[in-house]
């Protein structure tokens, strides 16, 4: 894990540019062996928890499907997270999050036939100066 990057970005709130998926904001929080993406989608607060070197289970937001997720830093400022959907529907949602000095880019790809359409594409956000 890149401790320097996690301490710089953990807890920062990013506001997304208007997008068709209706994501409005994004925050990443980290502990030693876990992380959490918190975001607003369709006006609802949502979270995806994941582990580093382990799977963390939860309920996938919007669709209420069980998932198991883990993440890995693939470079100094790029985090890759895969959430395996393990419920009535089976598939996965992939996140590649690139943290800049004052911005974030979130690339998302779903591997499931009928759901999770919001989690396909990319989002660009800027650090929010509002608190």
Where are these regions (language model features)?
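Peripheral terminal and inter-domain segments
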Residues: 1-131
């Amino acid at each position: 894990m890149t401790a320097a990057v996690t301490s710089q970005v953990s807890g920062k709130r990013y506001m997304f540019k208007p997008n068709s998926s209706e994501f409005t904001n994004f925050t990443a929080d980290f502990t030693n062996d876990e992380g959490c993406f918190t975001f607003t989608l369709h006006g609802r607060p949502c979270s995806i928890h994941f582990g580093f070197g382990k799977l963390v289970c939860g309920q996938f937001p919007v669709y209420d499907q069980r998932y198991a997720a883990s993440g890995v830093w693939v470079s100094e400022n790029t985090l890759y997270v895969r959430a395996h959907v393990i419920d009535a529907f089976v598939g996965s949602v992939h996140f590649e999050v690139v943290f800049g000095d004052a911005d974030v880019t979130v690339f998302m790809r779903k591997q499931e036939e009928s759901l999770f359409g919001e989690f396909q594409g990319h989002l660009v956000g800027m650090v929010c100066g509002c608190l």
